[in-house]
C-alpha cells in the first residue's frame, strides 16, 4: 500500500499552490493569498484539500453499538450522513485517539490526523472480540476535503482518483493556512497539535462536540465525569493574540512563560498558530488553570494576550460557551 500521507496531492499542481510544512506538506498551504482565501471560506465558498488525512471504514451490523461502547460519543441515534466527532480515552481519561466521521447505513467512515490511523486501527482491532464489525484503512482510495457552504460547511469524502474533478466543481481552492486560521479563531483544538499525552477532554472544550454526557460507560469516563461535576480542570485551552510586530509564528510545542526575571515560570505550551486576516497572528495554547486570565504571557520572546476559550471554572456549574 502506498502512503498518501507522504504522497503530494495532485491539487498541488493548481495555479499558485505552495506546499505546507511537516505532516501537512502533501497539501497546499495556500494558493497565492491566504488572507483572501480566508475571506472566501468565510463567505461560504470554496474548499480545502485535506487529502493527507487518514481515512478508515468500519463495517458490520454491530458497528454503531460497538463504537458507542468504546468511545466518548453517542452513536445509537446517529442519523445517516450526520458528521460526528469521537474520542478514545485511556483508563485515566487522557485523549489517545480522535476521529470524525459519518455513517452511510452500511459503514461508518472516519478520518483522523495524518499517520494516526494505524495506531487507531490497532487499538480498535484488539477490541473486536466476537463483535460483528470489519475494519479497514482506505486512505489509498478516499480523500478528505472541507467544503465551505453558506448553510452548513462540512467535510467531504472524495474518491482519491476524482480529486481534480471535485476541485473543478467545488472551487475556488483555499489552502490549509486559511482553514487553520479560521479554526484557531473559533477555538477548536487539533488533536496531536493542540493536545498532549496528558490532555483530558474537559481541558480543550471537547465536552459536547466530542463527549456525550448522557450515555453508558466507556473507558476513561470516571475522570471526565468527575472533572465535569467538580469543575476546574487542571489546564485550559486559551486563544493567544500574539505581538503583530514580529514576522514569525511560534512552533508547535513552544513553551509558554509567565513573569519576568527570576520569577519567570513555564505555564503551558503553544499548539497551532496562524495569521488571521482580521485578528493578526493568533495561536492556541494549553495553560495551567490558575494562570490569571488578564496576564500577558510570553512565547518565543513575543508577548501573548489571552482570550478565554475554556473557562478555568468550567464544569457542571459553568457550561462551555460555543465561540
Identify the meaning behind each predicted range.
Residues 2-5, 11, 99, 204-211, ...:
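Glycine-rich, small/acidic residue-mixed loop/short-helix segments
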Residues 34-43, 86-98, 129-131, 265-269:
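Short amphipathic beta-strand starts and helix->beta connectors
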Residues 46-47, 55, 94-189:
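Acidic, low-complexity central loop/insert segments
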Residues 62-67, 117-121, 161-169, 246-252, ...:
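Short, conserved charged micro-motifs
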Residues 158-241:
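Anionic-ligand-binding alpha/beta catalytic cores of soluble enzymes and soluble regulatory domains
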Residues 47-69, 136-149, 232-243:
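Short glycine-/aliphatic-rich beta-strand segments at the starts of folded cytosolic domains
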Residues 1-84, 94:
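Acidic, proline/glycine-enriched N-terminal capping motif
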Residues 143-151, 185-200, 315-323:
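Short, low-order "capping/linker" segments at domain edges
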Amino acid at each position: 500500500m502506498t502512503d498518501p500521507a507522504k504522497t503530494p496531492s495532485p491539487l498541488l499542481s493548481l495555479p499558485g499552490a505552495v506546499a505546507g510544512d511537516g505532516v501537512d506538506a502533501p497539501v497546499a498551504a495556500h494558493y497565492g493569498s491566504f488572507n483572501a482565501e480566508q475571506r472566501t471560506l468565510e463567505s461560504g465558498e470554496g474548499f480545502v484539500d485535506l487529502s493527507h488525512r487518514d481515512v478508515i471504514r468500519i463495517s458490520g451490523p454491530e458497528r454503531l453499538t460497538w463504537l458507542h461502547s468504546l468511545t466518548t460519543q453517542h452513536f445509537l441515534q446517529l442519523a445517516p450522513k450526520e458528521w460526528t466527532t469521537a474520542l478514545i480515552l485511556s483508563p485515566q481519561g487522557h485523549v489517545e485517539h480522535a476521529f470524525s466521521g459519518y455513517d452511510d447505513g452500511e459503514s461508518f467512515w472516519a478520518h483522523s490526523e495524518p499517520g494516526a490511523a494505524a495506531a487507531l486501527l490497532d487499538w480498535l482491532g484488539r477490541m473486536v472480540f466476537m463483535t460483528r464489525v470489519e475494519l479497514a484503512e482506505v486512505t489509498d482510495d478516499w480523500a478528505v476535503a472541507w467544503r465551505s457552504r453558506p448553510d452548513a460547511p462540512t467535510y467531504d469524502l472524495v474518491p482519491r482518483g476524482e480529486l481534480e474533478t471535485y476541485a473543478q466543481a467545488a472551487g475556488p481552492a483555499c489552502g490549509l493556512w486559511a482553514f487553520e486560521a479560521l479554526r484557531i479563531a473559533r477555538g477548536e483544538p487539533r488533536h496531536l497539535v493542540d493536545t498532549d499525552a496528558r490532555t483530558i477532554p474537559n481541558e480543550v472544550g471537547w465536552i459536547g462536540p466530542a463527549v456525550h454526557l448522557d450515555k453508558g460507560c466507556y473507558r476513561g469516563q470516571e475522570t471526565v465525569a468527575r472533572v465535569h461535576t467538580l469543575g476546574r480542570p487542571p489546564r485550559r485551552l486559551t486563544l493567544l493574540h500574539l505581538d503583530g510586530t514580529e514576522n514569525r509564528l511560534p512552533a508547535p510545542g513552544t513553551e509558554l512563560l509567565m513573569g519576568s526575571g527570576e520569577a519567570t515560570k513555564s505555564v503551558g505550551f503553544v499548539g497551532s498558530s496562524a495569521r488571521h486576516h482580521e485578528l493578526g497572528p493568533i495561536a492556541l495554547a494549553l495553560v495551567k488553570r490558575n494562570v490569571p486570565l488578564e496576564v500577558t504571557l510570553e512565547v518565543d520572546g513575543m508577548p501573548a494576550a489571552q482570550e478565554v476559550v475554556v473557562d478555568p471554572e468550567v464544569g457542571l456549574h459553568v457550561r462551555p460557551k460555543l465561540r
